[in-house]
């Protein structure tokens, strides 16, 4: 029997580029992560992009990635890139760094 995709925990590292700083992107990301039950963190990078670590079920992560492709209304996302990460670490909450 195949494992239930909503039970296995996935961890994704994501970079979001575009107009994503100074537009409430991190704050909105925290709100969306809480709404979806995602754990991890989000942070600004010096190059003007935003990075995030997402942890949750496949369905939760997919829904969060879909939201990140647009972000909050003031954001202008031009690129979302990421990769699944293998880790034993389990985040307790979703935080803004």
Curated annotation (Swiss-Prot):
Organism per entry: Paraburkholderia xenovorans (strain LB400)
InterPro entries: Acylphosphatase, Acylphosphatase-like_dom, Acylphosphatase-like_dom_sf, Acylphosphatase_CS
Active site, per annotation: 26, 44
Family: Belongs to the acylphosphatase family.
Ranges where the Acylphosphatase-like domain occurs: 11-97
Protein name: Acylphosphatase
Presence of the UniProt keyword Signal in the record: no
Chain residue ranges for the region called Disordered: 76-97
Keyword Hydrolase carried by entry: yes
One Pfam match: Acylphosphatase
Gene3D superfamilies in the cross-refs: 3.30.70.100
Enzyme class: hydrolase
């Amino acid at each position: 029997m195949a494992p239930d995709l909503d039970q296995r925990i996935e961890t994704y590292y994501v970079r979001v580029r575009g107009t994503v700083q100074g537009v409430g992107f991190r704050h909105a990301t925290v709100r969306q992560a809480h709404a979806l039950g995602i754990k991890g963190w989000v942070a600004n990078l010096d190059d003007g992009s935003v990075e995030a670590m997402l942890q949750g079920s496949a369905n939760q992560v997919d829904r969060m990635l879909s939201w990140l492709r647009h972000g909050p209304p003031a954001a202008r996302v031009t690129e979302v890139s990421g990769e699944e990460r293998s880790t034993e670490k389990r985040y307790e909450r979703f935080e803004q760094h």
